[in-house]
C-alpha cells in the first residue's frame, strides 16, 4: 500500500528534477562521452548514473550501516576495485580517439565503459548516501515505508535523473557536431582526469 501522498510525490519529483539539472561530475561525464563518442555513449553513461542513484536510494532506505556490516571486509575491497577500475576508465578516456560521430561505429565494449564511467563516478560520491538519508525523510516516513513507496521513489529517480542526464547527452551530442576535434580532445582530458582523481581518492580513502 502506498503511504506517500500525491503532494509528496510531486514535491519529490520537482526537487529531484532541479537537483539533477545542477552542474556536477555526472553531468560532465555524460556530456563528454556524448560530445566525443556520440549520443549513444552519453545515453549509456546516463544509464550508469541512474543506476548509481538507485543504489544510493536503496542504501539510504535500508541503512548504510546495515550494508557495511553485512558486506564486512568486502565493502573495503569493493572500494579498491572501484578506485582501480575508475582510474583505468579515466586513462582510457584520455587516450581515446575522437571519432567523427556520423561515421563512428558503435563498439559494445566502449558502450560498457561509458556505462561503467557513469555508474562509478556516481558511486564514488559517497556523500550522496548521506544526502539521500537526509533528503528522503522529508517526503516519506522511512520507518514505515512500503514496497510501493520504494517503487515510486525509484521510478521518480529514473524519470528525473535519467531524463535530465539524457537531455544533457542530447545537447552535448548536438554541440559535438559543431565542436572541433581539438576541443573534444580537451573534454576527454578533463573527464579522464576527473575519473582518475576520483579513483585515486577512493584508493587512498579505503
From Swiss-Prot:
Query: Which keywords accompany this UniProt record?
Result: Cell membrane, Membrane, Transmembrane, Transmembrane helix
* Localization, UniProt: Cell membrane
Q: What's a BP term from Gene Ontology annotated to this protein?
A: amino acid transport
Q: Which domain of life is it from?
A: Bacteria
The main location is membrane
GO cellular component terms? plasma membrane
The membrane topology noted for this protein in its Swiss-Prot or TrEMBL record is: Multi-pass membrane protein
Carries keyword Kinase?
Answer: no
What are the GO MF terms of this UniProt record? amino acid transmembrane transporter activity
UniProt keyword Cell membrane present = yes
Which segments cross the bilayer?
Answer: 9-29, 47-67, 74-94, 150-170
Instruction: State the similarity comment.
Output: Belongs to the Rht family.
According to UniProt, the name of this protein is Uncharacterized membrane protein slr1627
Write down the species: Synechocystis sp. (strain ATCC 27184 / PCC 6803 / Kazusa)
Upper taxonomic lineage: Bacteria, Bacillati, Cyanobacteriota, Cyanophyceae, Synechococcales
